Amino acid sequence: IYFKDNKETTFSAYYPYSKFLTDGKMNWNIAEVEANQPCKADVLFASGATASKASPTVNFTDAEHRFKHCMSLVEFKIKPGQGVKDNNYKFNSLNMKGIFTSGKFDTRTGSVETAGDRATLTRVFNDVPFESEESFAYIMLPQSLESNKMDIEIYLLLNDSEVKYTTPITPSTNGQFEGGKKYTYNITVKNTGITIEKANIVPWENGDSSDLDADIAL
């Protein structure tokens, strides 16, 4: 870094780097987290670190100026319960309804904005035997939810007949997914419906963690 005078300069930084910016903003799309793989949707931002000609080292490691997660991490742990476990059900798909799946990240300020319309995100399981817990997670855009909830649809197969279970998820953080937080939802699917335990929310450091029940759709 070259300093032309002795004035102190304030720095910001972001990750991952993108050379495709418009007015300092990069496009963003929701992505599933893959084990032991970096997720390009996990955007980090740091600001406020200073340096000068006399002290040229830029330090983003202290608590106040360290990198922070800008998006939300939403994790699902779905297991078979009474009437479903040991009955040869297969996991067909899961829908997350009414969410923004794309947006823009401002590399100068660290702010995030939604883009486009609300949509349904589908995760396909390709008829996986539903005998034990299935877990997966998505990096999601921080957002307010329509009517403060995200509807979940779970589709199981039994002897090639599809059974639909539904449940709403309402984040305790004012009905929205907040940036920098991890939300964990433990969902039990039973032949009478779905149970969701109380959500666990922690700074991502972490967000919600809850146990949920889903009702069978008639």
Region locations from a protein language model:
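Conserved small-residue
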Residues: 114-123
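Extracellular low-complexity Ser/Thr/Asn/Gly-rich intrinsically disordered segments
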Residues: 16-18, 101, 105, 110, ...
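Short, low-hydrophobicity acidic/polar segments
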Residues: 1-90, 124, 128-136, 178, ...
